[in-house]
Amino acid sequence: MITLENVNKIYSNNLHAVKDVNLKVNEGDIFGIIGLSGAGKSSLIRLINRLEEPTSGKIFINGENILNLNKTELLERRKKIGMIFQHFNLLSSRTVEENVAFALEIANWNKKDIGKRVSELLEIVGLSDKAKYYPSQLSGGQKQRVSIARALANNPDILLSDEATSALDPKTTKSILELIKEIQQKFSLTVLMITHQMEVVKEICNKVAIMSDGRIVEQGGVHHIFAEPKNEITKELISYVHQQTDTELNYLHHKGKKIIKVKFLGTSTQEPIISKVIKEYGIDISVFGGTIDKLATMNIGHLYLELDGDLAAQTKAIEFMQTMDVIVEVIYNGD
C-alpha cells in the first residue's frame, strides 16, 4: 500500500529531518510511528501526500511512485488520502457542516450531493446534532471529530494522523482512538499514525516504527516490539509505560536474590513454568506483582519475580525459563 525507499528530507537551513527511511505499510494496517520530539515523525508523514517534497528517495502508493506525478495527478491522488492534525485546522468562520463541506467543494462535488454526504459523515463521527455549531462552541474532542469527518469526505483509502490526540485529555483520546479504529474497520482504511504517546500505539496499532534523529531505528509488530525491544530509544519509550513498577523494584534488592521480569505473550501461561522451576532447581520464587499490556494485537503479561536459593541454581533456572515460550529479563543479578 505505502512503501518508502531511502527517503531523505533536508530543509533549506540544512536540517536533515528524515534520513534514509525505508518503510512498508500494508493494506489494512494501523501503523504507528513513534519517537521523541524532533525525531522527524511529522516531517515524514507530510512527505507521504507531498505536503512536503522529499530531497531524495522514492514514495510508492499502490505501486505508483507519487514523486512522478504532475500537479493535476497529485491533486487527484490526494482525494484518496485523508489527513487529521493535532490542532484540527478548522475554519473558524464556518459551521461544522460547512467545514466538512469545504473538503467536498474543493474536490468539485456536485452541490446537490454535498448536503447528503455531509449528513452521512456527521452521523459517522457522532456530531449530527452539532451541524450548525461553530468550532468555538465545540470541545477539543468534538473539533477532532469534525476533522475526521472532513478527512473521510472523499472516501479515502488511506488516513494519515499527525499527533491527532496529543492535545486531548486521556478520556477524549480513548474515544477518538475508538472512533478511528471503528472507521478503519468499517471502511477498510489503511491508517498511518504519528504519535509520541506509547499508550496510543498500545491501544490501536498493529505495527510500529520508532524514529530517532530522523532515522527509523526499529520496527515490527507491536507485540514483538513491546516484548523484546532492541534499540535503547525503544526501551526508553516503553519504560514510561511501566515506570512505576520498575521504579518500585529498585527498592527491593536483596543480596543473593535475583529479580527477573517474565513476559508472557498471548495465551501462554505462567503457573506450569514457575512450579516446574521450583521443583527442578530447588529454589523459592516470590511474586512481587504483575501488569498486563493490552495491545491491539494481543496481550503481554509481565510478572515480577524474586528468586531465592543457591545463586548457581537461580542462574540455571533463568536459563531454563529462557528456553520456554516466555521472555526473561534480569532486573537485579543478586550481587
UniProtKB/Swiss-Prot annotation:
Its EC number is 7.4.2.11. PANTHER family: AMINO ACID IMPORT ATP-BINDING PROTEIN, METHIONINE IMPORT ATP-BINDING PROTEIN METN. The complex is composed of two ATP-binding proteins (MetN), two transmembrane proteins (MetI) and a solute-binding protein (MetQ). One of its GO terms (molecular function) is ATP binding. The keyword Cell inner membrane applies. Keywords: Amino-acid transport, ATP-binding, Cell inner membrane, Cell membrane, Membrane, Nucleotide-binding, Translocase, Transport. It is an enzyme of class 7 (translocase). This is Methionine import ATP-binding protein MetN. One of its GO terms (cellular component) is plasma membrane. ATP binds at G35, L36, S37, G38, A39, G40, K41, S42. It catalyses: L-methionine(out) + ATP + H2O = L-methionine(in) + ADP + phosphate + H(+); D-methionine(out) + ATP + H2O = D-methionine(in) + ADP + phosphate + H(+). Belongs to the ABC transporter superfamily. Methionine importer (TC 3.A.1.24) family. Pfam families: ABC_tran (PF00005), NIL (PF09383). Part of the ABC transporter complex MetNIQ involved in methionine import. Responsible for energy coupling to the transport system. InterPro entries: AAA+_ATPase, ABC_transporter-like_ATP-bd, ABC_transporter-like_CS, ACT-like_dom_sf, MetN_ABC, MetN_ABC_transporter-like, NIL_domain, P-loop_NTPase. Its main location: membrane. Residues 2-238 form the ABC transporter domain. It comes from Fusobacterium nucleatum subsp. nucleatum (strain ATCC 25586 / DSM 15643 / BCRC 10681 / CIP 101130 / JCM 8532 / KCTC 2640 / LMG 13131 / VPI 4355). It is a peripheral membrane protein. Coiled coil: none annotated. It is found in: Cell inner membrane.
